[in-house]
Structure formats: structure tokens, C-alpha cells
């Protein structure tokens, strides 16, 4: 499962430290053909940047999508080892949280789990990132929430998606990316679908 704002294509186009998963696996299988596997990269991105692979009334049912849609589709279209003993769920960053979350909630579907890059999810992770402790970030969030309250209700979801897209386009890894991730995190773990944009 990819991390926050990571596109599935980044696993094969070299964006992630030159990684091309296709070449890596081909080289591995050339020396160990008995270690066959089907690798599926599940898209967990949404309009706010990431779903955290949880079900949310604001951003959708990402846990269900992973377990109830992706797994059966792969089993129906490929020669798989069906059942939990034939499946490993792995993830990085947001995807690491998702892998642990989904695998623990669905032990009947996944027999193994691997997670890397969970820094944001430890006891002080959000503080260490500055998501809740940077005064400028907190101030910007409240100012933006007041502005969003003025949007016509029917335009709310589309305008919020545009707002998030602009944040990430301006600075996906810095301050603006942190602002966007705060909205995505809130929509996943503290959703308020009736509260208007940003729905947290």
C-alpha cells in the first residue's frame, strides 16, 4: 500500500529513489523462480491526498475497497493462492498504517503483514511532524475553515478537492503538504460529514 500522496506509478517509474518494482522483481525471480508472486499496488489516494485505508463517511470506504473489492478481483482474474496463507499485505508510511490496520481487522484475508515508515503513527508522531504544534499551521487551518464555511454547500466537495490540489501543487513535502495532510488525517479519523468543508 503506497504512502501519503504516492501514486501507484511511482513504484515503476523511478520516482521513489530510482525504484522500478518490475525490474527488481524480475531480477529476484530470475534467481529464484520458485518464489512466484503476484504484486498488486492498491491506490489509496483521494482528493485530500490519502485515505489511510480506513472507512470514512467523508472520503469513502477504503478498507472495504481493499478487502472486498481488490482481493476478490485479483483472485477472479489471476492464478492466485487463495486464502490468507497466500497473501501478504505491505505498506509504506500511510500505507504501513493501512497494512497493519487492514491486516489486523481482516486476519482471515491476510496471513502476513509488513510495515515500514510508521514514524507519523507512534506516540508523538503528529507532534514530531508539527501537524498539531506549529502555530502557523494551526492558525492557517482555522482561517481556512472560516473561509470554507462561506462556500455554497453544493460546491463544498469540489472546492475542497481543488483547494487540496493547489496545496500539494505548491509544496507537497513542506508546509503546504503538512496542511493538506492535516485535512486528510482529520477526514479519515475525525470525520464530520454534516459539518461542511473540510468535513472534520
PLM features: residue spans?
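Non-catalytic cap/lid and distal C-terminal segments of serine-dependent acyl enzymes
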Residues: 1-200
Amino acid at each position: 500500500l503506497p504512502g501519503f500522496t504516492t501514486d501507484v506509478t511511482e513504484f515503476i517509474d523511478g520516482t521513489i529513489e530510482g525504484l522500478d518494482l518490475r525490474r527488481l522483481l524480475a531480477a529476484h525471480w530470475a534467481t529464484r523462480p520458485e518464489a512466484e508472486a503476484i504484486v498488486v499496488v492498491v491506490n489509496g489516494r483521494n482528493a485530500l491526498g490519502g485515505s489511510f485505508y480506513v472507512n470514512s463517511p467523508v472520503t469513502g470506504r477504503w478498507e472495504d475497497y481493499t478487502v472486498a473489492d481488490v482481493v476478490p478481483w485479483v483472485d477472479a482474474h489471476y492464478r492466485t493462492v487463495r486464502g490468507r496463507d497466500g497473501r501478504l499485505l505491505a505498506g509504506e508510511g500511510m500505507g504501513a498504517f493501512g497494512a497493519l490496520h487492514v491486516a489486523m481487522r481482516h486476519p482471515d484475508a491476510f496471513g502476513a503483514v509488513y510495515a515500514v515508515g510508521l514514524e507519523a503513527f507512534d506516540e508523538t508522531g503528529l507532534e514530531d511532524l508539527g501537524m498539531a504544534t506549529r502555530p502557523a499551521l494551526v492558525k492557517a487551518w482555522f482561517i481556512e475553515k472560516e473561509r470554507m464555511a462561506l462556500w455554497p454547500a453544493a460546491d463544498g466537495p469540489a472546492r475542497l478537492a481543488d483547494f487540496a490540489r493547489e496545496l500539494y501543487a505548491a509544496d507537497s513535502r513542506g508546509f503546504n503538504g503538512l496542511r493538506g495532510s492535516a485535512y486528510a488525517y482529520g477526514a479519515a479519523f475525525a470525520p464530520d460529514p454534516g459539518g461542511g468543508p473540510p468535513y472534520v
